[in-house]
């Protein structure tokens, strides 16, 4: 009997809580606080340097690795071109050419690729990608092409 009473009493509270959890995009202040926290508190390895040489071959290797491992969510150009769900995720898939992503150091970008960013949709890939693959992707991110210039990922055009 006490469990039934507790369940009946808790049901309206649960309903009110769920109603209050409506998914709204974050405001400017909330976004600024979260971005500050990501850059200063959650993402590490700020001083780690990229050992991959900044050469056309290094950039091409990064583009190749990016097209295999990252393009499904970020598009071939890292700006979500042709990714049908990118703007419907919560939070939306960011443009990696944008100021927020480009303001990370190379070491921080490697850390993000290694460990992901929770609770966003960015998974970690430590153990799946080699350090050289990750560093080459970081190098590619520093040399992104114009939005849409590489077309859409084949997986969405076939």
Short names for language-model regions:
Residues 22-24:
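Bacterial signal peptide processing site
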Residues 28-65, 157-158:
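Electrostatic cytochrome c docking/interface patches
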Residues 17-20:
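C-terminal motif of bacterial Sec signal peptides marking the signal peptidase cleavage site
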Residues 26, 44, 67, 103, ...:
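Flexible coil segments in periplasmic/lumen-exposed cytochrome c-class electron-transfer proteins
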Residues 55-81, 86, 109:
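Sequence/structural segment immediately N-terminal to covalent heme-attachment motifs in c-type
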Residues 1-9:
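Bacterial N-terminal signal peptides that target proteins for export
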Residues 100-114:
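Short Fe-S-cluster ligation motifs
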Residues 51, 95, 121-124:
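Conserved beta-strand positions that form and line the central face of beta-propeller blades
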């Amino acid at each position: 009997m006490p469990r039934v009473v507790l369940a009946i009493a808790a049901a309206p509270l649960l309903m009110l809580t769920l109603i209050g959890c409506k998914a709204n995009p974050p405001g400017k202040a909330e976004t600024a606080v979260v971005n500050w926290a990501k850059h200063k508190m959650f993402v590490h390895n700020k001083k780690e340097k990229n050992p991959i040489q900044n050469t056309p071959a290094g950039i091409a290797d990064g583009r190749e690795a990016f097209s295999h491992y990252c393009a499904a969510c970020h598009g071939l150009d890292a700006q979500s071109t042709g990714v049908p769900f990118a703007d419907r995720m919560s939070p939306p898939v960011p443009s990696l050419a944008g100021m927020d992503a480009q303001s990370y150091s190379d070491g921080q970008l490697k850390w993000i690729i290694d460990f992901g960013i929770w609770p966003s949709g960015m998974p970690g890939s430590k153990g799946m990608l080699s350090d050289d693959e990750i560093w080459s992707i970081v190098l590619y991110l520093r040399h992104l092409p114009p939005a849409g210039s590489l077309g859409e990922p084949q997986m969405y055009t076939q």
